[in-house]
Amino acid sequence: MTAHTRPRALAAMDTTLDDFTERLFGHLPRADQRRWARVYLQGLLTTPGKKSVRRLAASVTASPTASQSLQQFINASPWDWDPARRELLRWVEERHPVHAWTIGQAVFPKRGEHSVGVHRRFDPAAGRAVNCQFGFGLFLSLGGMSVPVDWRLLLPEPWAADPVLRGRARISPDVAHRTPEALVLELVDAMAVHTSSAHAPVVADLSRLSGAGPLIGLLGRRGHDFLVSIPPALAVSAAGAAPGRGEPAGAPGREITAGDLARSGNTRHPYTALLAGPAARPQRLRIDSGLVRVPGAESGAPGTRRTYRLFGERHPGAGHGGGPVWITNMTGHRMDDLLHLVRQSAESARALGSLTEDFGLLDFEGRSFPGWHHHMTLMSAAYAYRALPALRDRQGRQGYPVLEVRQSA
């Protein structure tokens, strides 16, 4: 990097950003790769508006060739993103306790059909089918904030099977088509291998995944605690309970949909949850809960019939109204602990909003598979670098909303 391509100053951020870049990207074999990683990070942190490669380069250096070099680094340079993600994971874990591993979903709208993994898909936010990429991120929930540390891109079968498409997008031979459920499990498996702290509960929105039943069975058999929202149409059966335990009345073993069971409100002792905080008006929610079994989660092996807790929120006078239905294998946990984990899912959704608005989540313009992963890795690093100091500062100044949960009389 010549004097003309040296990054513009970041004032007090300079030294710490240098150290941060060296820690995460020190594995890159060439010095110029490490320098361009630093330029990209600085650009993400300082460039207002759209985070195109051209704008990132222009905000950091006056070099007329910087944009081309940065484009080469992101889209064509064959560097491995996994070591950087593992180091980012360790960097975050060293600085803050992790409350949950949260799975977030992201839709990346695209105009053309040449970006890797592009396909037609229904986007709930848009309310219609869109041309897009679709991916999952694993977030570390830190209590007040969630930080992404790993990503997976859905590769539809046509992209996986067509050698021309694979070659054009530079898809590695070991990358195959995987279902959304398999990608979620892959993220959790990778996290379990690389984390340096105790395993945290998995929190995820599986409400639009057709294979949610088998997936929760696989999570349980891998030894993970989990709390996930499930499709209302998922078949469950009441597990039954001793009288007075507050479980749904009805015939144990009879199959019913999760949504119907949650909407029935047939609970002897419902919970009342009070959501309160320094900046929010308290909200009172009724929580209906029951023990269930999930036929689709069973492995078929003897002794594998597991019991789960299913619950949903009921606003007074309004019923469930199609709200989320949650299920967990943490049947012995207090309801207030479970509702605290529900909030972690909302935190990852807020993080996705911030990544979109401030860190260029949807701004990657390249078409290659490695380029997508390079951008997502650097974007996650920039977000963590900015977010963790802000979280510590905020936690020092004010508390966070708490859920007071008690059984109603």
Predicted regions, residues:
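A short, flexible helix-boundary coil/loop motif
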Residues: 1-20, 24-33, 155, 245-297, ...
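An anionic, glycine-rich sequence signature occurring as long contiguous blocks
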Residues: 146-147, 152, 227-231, 236-344
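Gly/serine-rich nucleotide phosphate-binding loop at the start of the catalytic core
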Residues: 2-71
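Short, conserved catalytic/metal-binding motifs centered on acidic residues
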Residues: 56, 99-109, 138, 200-209, ...
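Domain-level cores of phosphate- or acyl-group-handling catalytic modules
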Residues: 169-241
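Active-site-proximal, Lys/Arg-enriched surface segment
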Residues: 78-158
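Electropositive, glycine- and tryptophan-enriched low-complexity nucleic-acid-binding patches
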Residues: 126-199, 322-323
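Short amphipathic alpha-helical "interface-anchor" segments enriched in bulky aromatics
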Residues: 332-366
